[in-house]
Amino acid sequence: MDGFAQDWPSLTHTTDNVLTMDQLGGVSGAVGDLPGDVGFEPQTRARSNTWPCPHPEPFVEPADELDSTKASNQQLAAGDSQQTIQSANAAKKNSARRNAWGNLSYADLITHAIGSATDKRLTLSQIYEWMVQNVPYFKDKGDSNSSAGWKNSIRHNLSLHNRFMRVQNEGTGKSSWWMLNPEAKPGKSVRRRAASMETSRYEKRRGRAKKRVEALRQAGVVGLNDATPSPSSSVSEGLDHFPESPLHSGGFQLSPDFRQRASSNASSCGRLSPIRALDLEPEWGFTVDYQNTTLTQAQSQVLDQLAGSIADELKLHPDMLQQQGFSAASGLPTQPPPPPYPAPQQQQQQQPQQQQAYTLNGGPPGGYASLQPQPQCLIHRSLNCSCLHNARDGLSPNSVTTTMSPAYPNSEPSSDSLNTYSNVVIDGSGDNGSLLVQQQRQQQQQQQQQQQLGSNLEGQCLEVLNNEAQPIDEFNLENFPVENLECNMEELLQQEMSYDGLLDINIPLAAVSTNAPLVNLINNSSTTISSSSNIGCSTTTSSSSLSASAQLNQLQAQLQQQHQQQQQQQQQQQQQQLQQQQQQLLLNNNNNNNNSLELATQTASANLNARVQYSQPSVVTSPPSWVH
């Protein structure tokens, strides 16, 4: 091969128990010259003939890495190869040869091959050729049959060791170059072992750590967690000064809030509460000693409530749920019939209980106001309507017995006596207590009035208009309480005119004639004002009820017409289907008749042909006259 500077140096051994190649050749020649009658005793040998050879008896394995692997990582010049091989062989004085060709490994041979090239690079085929030409062991193993094993080993070592570097060849269709990596570390690349091979070392290291921990415990090293121990803290049992932990370099101590992932409270979402912790500090500046703080019974109960889950904290008061008609699971109005309305005295007793259940330190309840249904005028569909205010103020202070109709389908009306508190005497001194009592009673009166209006209107009007399952004939406004309602005609007209003709107001002439003197009587006395307003409101409500009933009748008629049309269409479709079926039957019958006729004609013609052939006599032809 032209690319090498010189031939591979001869392998000489200086050991006593290993012969060189030349000596081995001389010995073989001498043995060949011996006469045949010289007898040698048969030598016993081991069963296995594989390499490496078994070690001799006094063999001691060196503790450190071989010098050959350390020296072979560098680029070797041609002149220094002899000294390197001698030093490598000198390191193995007490051991047998590692391989069949000597103590050099495949990596060492590849290193010598690449280093002996002029441009310090070889392809894979050139490395094979160098092995066959320069190593005596591979001279007779260059053919394809016997070279598969050692060529595979060479490829394996090229990819395994970090001392070899693969460079892409510039030419197309050519194999890559293999070069020596000058930046590679000495020795083999670190290979990761399985955990099962290092169990003894791991157990030793773990035992040492346990001994150190016990020594620290006995020495009395106390961490920060010993003062205020927590059940979920991962810094357990005085391990704050563990010397070999990467977290403790420099001797720092872990915080007591440091927690392990498995024992942290982030994994238990059910125990977390979005409510802020109870503030036990007073309003002044200095902090409170929590160890000496004595909690009151109310505060301890509050803390016990806050320690529960979110579902336990968001429970609503059962009395309020029954009163408002909400379900505790979903917060939506429930469909079963409501219970009877409680008396005002029961409501007075329930209201302070609800306030106590929703306040911690006497403050106003936060979420109770949002659950109260807002009053809405069912005629004008607005919250701020004068009809509601006039209806609230126009109720008589005496006890009124009315028929209550709950706003739920298929429920019976319940009659309760609503006692309004009209005998309230407020002192002129303006005492705060009397003002609070007055406000509470006014709120209770408003709630009772809202229940009156809402139950009557929702039970009779809204149930019919919004529920499609109920028939339209159940709409009835005869029991509508119009005696105590007052209405502003100007506001009503403006409200109706703002709908741009969507709603009609039909005021009869008699009602207009009665409204004219009533307007004059408004300026004279308050009694005439209330009566005229009552009459006006009654006329408007009657007119609106008439228009609503007319619209409902129209809707009912339209629905009936649509139903009749659908029935007619269904009947027509059924008739068409019947006609099509009859036509198909007729066609099938005609086809069958035609087929039967064809078959009959065919059989008849066949019979006639057979008869004709059978009845014809045999014709004997006579010879012509000229034949004698």
UniProtKB/Swiss-Prot annotation:
Skewed-composition ranges (Polar residues): 227-236, 261-270, 411-423
One annotated GO biological process: negative regulation of insulin receptor signaling pathway
Highest taxon of the lineage: Eukaryota
Cellular component aspect of the GO annotation: cytoplasm; nucleus
Modified residues (Phosphoserine): 81, 196, 264, 267-268, 273
Flavoprotein as UniProt keyword: no
CDD domains registered for this protein in UniProt: FH_FOXO
Record keywords: Activator, Cell cycle, Cytoplasm, Developmental protein, Differentiation, DNA-binding, Growth regulation, Nucleus, Phosphoprotein, Transcription, Transcription regulation
Binding region for DNA: 101-207
Stretches with biased composition (Pro residues): 334-343
Subcellular localization: Cytoplasm; Nucleus
Low complexity bias: start-end ranges: 344-359, 438-451
Name of this protein: Forkhead box protein O
